[in-house]
Amino acid sequence: YFLKNTDRLCMNCFAPLTAGSVCPGCGFDNDQENDTSFLPLRTVLQDRYVLGHVQAWESDAAVYAAYDRTLQAPCVVREFLPKGIANRLEGNREVHVRERFRKNFDGYKRSFTTLWQTMMQLRTLAAALPVYDVFPANETVYAVSQPVDGVPLREFLLRTPEGYIPWEQARIMFMPVLTTLEALHDRGVIHGSITPDNLLLCPDGKVRLKGFCIAQCNTVQSDLEFNLNEGYTAIEQYDNDRKMCPATDIYAFSACIYRALVGSNPPDAPSRETNDKLMIPNKIAESIPTHVIRALGAGLQIYPENRAQSAARLRELLNAAPSVVAQAAQAAQPPQPEPKPQPAPQPDVRHSAPPKEKPKGGKNKAVIIILVVLIVAAVAAGIYVVKFSGLVDGRENTTQAAS
């Protein structure tokens, strides 16, 4: 159970210890033991993973710094150890569950297994945690992932001079995360706790999503510790009569974009039920594209049935800039609306004169026609008389005589 040849490795960062118990790199004192609720330092799981210092105890799991002897590299091990219903008795490796929580514990453990097996299947996605092993042991379940270094989005924003960033910069950060969210939702996984603290800006340029836990940690009606994040927790997570859905993550994700663009957290969801105003200072609003503001409005609707319902829909709204819409229109014809009754054909005004107003009465028209006929007849008669009365010929003879 214990690996002797790791005695000279730091149990926090796994760098070699040069002298003494304090790591010169991370400052961890290796004489410090884990609390008795957790497994001791240098415990080995699966004859492969050496457990180090406990980094955190989250709602559903203890998170250990660890070392993978097969890969000869640090890793992170999550042990399903839900707060309030399970612990570990001193000297025992097996997890101890309070009897009245046994049934719930078994259900939560299945949820934990499903969550991390799904994460392992999706580990190649840009924003996903690189999980590579899930296994049962010690009456519980463990999930192993590669360590992910990065700066939380909240910390990054606080380092900027204004406390917020322009949309063009935010777009590069956020849009790949939507692809990962969409894949998770397609597999039935709801994150339920997306915040600026759980979005990591990594050295490789990717933004990764951390803070995953089973869904039961993200609703008030659960036996487990509720992960409340004011401004980011959706109204359905406060309400026993509503269930989480993909729109729950859309709300939190939109709130993160709002924080990045505006520089402050949105109001918490319960307060918005009585005062639903998301104020953006004019100076900032002028720099945010109109279609992005509309997309945030769709993502931050209080009630889930009124929100953008999927990551794909939110992506469409965020991409709805006029130039993007024009490009999309060239690539594919949009759905055509149902045909409507067409009005009677109109004359082509480009090639014909406008129709003239009709006479008021048919009698006037007949009179005019008769007059025209009479005039034409009179003229014809006059020509006949003149031509055959000798006047023309006499005029010609006179001309000839004068010559």
Enumerate the language-model features and the residues they cover:
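Activation-segment/catalytic-loop signature of the eukaryotic protein kinase fold
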Residues: 133-134
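Conserved short submotifs of the Hanks-type protein kinase catalytic core
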Residues: 137-152, 156
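Catalytic-loop of the protein kinase fold
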Residues: 181, 185-202
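Activation segment signature within eukaryotic-like protein kinase domains
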Residues: 173-174
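Protein kinase glycine-rich loop
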Residues: 52-58, 63
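AlphaC helix of the protein kinase catalytic domain
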Residues: 153-165
